[in-house]
């Protein structure tokens, strides 16, 4: 585990000691090296998991998420160059240091064995993200977005801390590797139901569940490009990962308690896709599409069958790469037209033909076209949900239909039509941007050849 955490921490002195013209090059190349080192974790010789120490372990559920985290740092650094072009060198270095700190915390969160340690790291990831949003955001509303983000997350996860401390007292240990062998502590009393709610609420706010999702569009819209990427790709996955980990203590309450949340997810899935059709703001549209994808993941985790877990992990990885790519594309538009309104950035296909092909590929991946892993995840989740109840096919079918509609609506609005006059003299597509898009698409395409490496511990 140290082979990932130590180089990541050492990236901070590397960034601060780099010369003015080498900051971006050094941080990008070294973070790519770290992400290549992390690939070795995929080849696990044991069937169960790799125990690095008492503190850290990796199993087939956390490994793909750790690799996604390390893969995203170079992409965030590449994407942020244009955004920070007017900043002083010190501020650039500070910005990169924030991203590196966030990555180190996330790697440790995904590999923590102890639930209290997991909770501390889970909350610690809030701080760098908050600084990114409130310091480097674009509009003045970023402070409002930061408040929403902070209070939603904190209010949601405080009950979890109380319950974890209580469980530490009753069970004697909160080690994830031990907990699964303990006798079940929860009974069918109302206190057990409250405990279940307290444990799940923290992760449902983070996912976010429809109804608790108001912080997400705000935070996404106001965050700088790297903030949006890390929020969509990894911080939402923390919720899913935490839910999968904590449900093993909460047996057998989940089966009886999950119905209202599953109904809310199904309803929210259709509602957020319908909200997407009404959006004028590009970033807001992608943020709401994240909510609808994550609703599928919540459904899958609450059903608790091997297939649904496989679908949830596949969908989390797929969504991480896809939504991150869409945010990068939205950012390239924003850098050229200085507006997130879709109507003001229309007809760009004639001006930026290469970017239009990236837009097409990203939109098709987002609507889960075969052979992408998005399709594999959605199919697995849809099948298990249908097996759980046949009626859900109405909501799921409608969700898939509207997802296709808003993805194509986003593509057509930005790429087709007559372009506006203020876009005559825009900059061409840079190699940096094409590389960025390729580095998002490549894992999606390669994983569709061999998807079993991201299907989680039950494959």
UniProtKB/Swiss-Prot annotation:
Top EC category: translocase
Alphabetized Pfam families for the sequence: Oxidored_q5_N, Proton_antipo_M
Enzyme nomenclature, EC number: 7.1.1.2
Any one of the GO BP annotations: mitochondrial respiratory chain complex I assembly
Sequence intervals crossing the membrane: 23-43, 60-80, 92-112, 113-133, 145-165, 196-216, 224-244, 257-277, 284-303, 308-330, 351-371, 392-412, 436-456
Main subcellular location of this protein, as a coarse class: mitochondrion
UniProt entry tagged with the keyword Amino-acid biosynthesis: no
Entry keyword Electron transport: yes
Localization per record: Mitochondrion inner membrane
Keyword terms of this UniProt record: Electron transport, Membrane, Mitochondrion, Mitochondrion inner membrane, NAD, Respiratory chain, Translocase, Transmembrane, Transmembrane helix, Transport, Ubiquinone
GO CC term (a single one): respiratory chain complex I
GO molecular function, one term: NADH dehydrogenase (ubiquinone) activity
Highest taxon listed in the record's lineage: Eukaryota
InterPro entries: NADH4_N, NADH_Q_OxRdtase_chainM/4, NADH_UbQ_OxRdtase, ND/Mrp_TM
Membrane association type: Multi-pass membrane protein
Reactions this protein catalyses: a ubiquinone + NADH + 5 H(+)(in) = a ubiquinol + NAD(+) + 4 H(+)(out)
Assembly behavior: Core subunit of respiratory chain NADH dehydrogenase (Complex I) which is composed of 45 different subunits.
Family: Belongs to the complex I subunit 4 family.
Main function: Core subunit of the mitochondrial membrane respiratory chain NADH dehydrogenase (Complex I) which catalyzes electron transfer from NADH through the respiratory chain, using ubiquinone as an electron acceptor. Essential for the catalytic activity and assembly of complex I.
The protein, known as: NADH-ubiquinone oxidoreductase chain 4
Gene (name only): MT-ND4
């Amino acid at each position: 585990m140290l082979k990932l955490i130590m180089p990541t921490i050492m990236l901070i002195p590397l960034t601060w000691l780099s010369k003015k013209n080498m900051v971006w090059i050094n941080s990008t190349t070294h973070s790519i090296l770290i992400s290549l080192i992390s690939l070795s974790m995929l080849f696990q010789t044991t069937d169960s998991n790799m125990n690095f120490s008492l503190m850290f372990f990796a199993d087939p559920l956390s490994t793909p998420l750790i690799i996604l985290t390390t893969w995203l740092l170079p992409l965030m650094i590449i994407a942020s160059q244009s955004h920070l072009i007017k900043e002083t060198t010190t501020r650039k270095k500070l910005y990169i240091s924030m991203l590196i700190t966030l990555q180190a915390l996330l790697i440790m969160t995904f590999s923590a064995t102890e639930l209290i340690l997991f909770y501390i790291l889970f909350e610690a990831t809030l701080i760098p993200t908050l600084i990114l949003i409130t310091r480097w955001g674009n509009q003045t509303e970023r402070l409002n977005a930061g408040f929403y983000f902070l209070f939603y997350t904190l209010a949601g996860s405080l009950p979890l801390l109380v319950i974890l401390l209580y469980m530490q007292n009753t069970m004697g240990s909160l080690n994830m590797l031990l907990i699964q062998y303990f006798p079940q502590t929860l009974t069918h009393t109302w206190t057990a139901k409250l405990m279940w709610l307290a444990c799940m609420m923290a992760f449902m706010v983070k996912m976010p569940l429809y109804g608790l999702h108001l912080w997400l569009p705000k935070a996404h819209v106001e965050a700088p490009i790297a903030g949006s990427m890390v929020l969509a790709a990894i911080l939402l996955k923390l919720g899913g990962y935490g839910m999968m980990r904590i449900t093993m203590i909460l047996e057998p309450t989940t089966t009886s308690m999950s119905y209202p949340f599953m109904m809310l997810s199904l309803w929210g899935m259709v509602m957020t896709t319908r909200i997407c059709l009404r959006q004028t703001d590009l970033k807001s549209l992608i943020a709401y599409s994240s909510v609808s994808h994550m609703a599928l993941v919540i459904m899958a985790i609450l059903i608790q069958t091997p297939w649904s877990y496989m679908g949830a992990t596949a969908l989390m990885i797929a969504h991480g790469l896809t939504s991150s790519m869409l945010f990068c594309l939205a950012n390239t538009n924003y850098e050229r037209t200085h507006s997130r309104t879709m109507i003001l950035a229309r007809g760009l296909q004639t001006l930026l033909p290469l970017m239009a092909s990236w837009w097409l590929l990203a939109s098709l991946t987002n609507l889960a076209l075969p052979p992408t892993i998005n399709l594999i995840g959605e199919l697995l989740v849809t099948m298990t949900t249908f097996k759980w109840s046949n009626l859900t096919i109405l909501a799921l079918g409608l969700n898939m239909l509207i997802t296709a509609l808003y993805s194509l609506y986003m593509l057509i609005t930005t790429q087709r039509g007559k372009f506006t006059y203020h876009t005559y003299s825009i900059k061409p597509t840079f190699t940096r941007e094409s590389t960025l898009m390729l580095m998002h698409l490549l894992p999606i395409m390669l994983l569709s050849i061999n998807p079993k490496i991201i299907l989680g511990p039950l494959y």
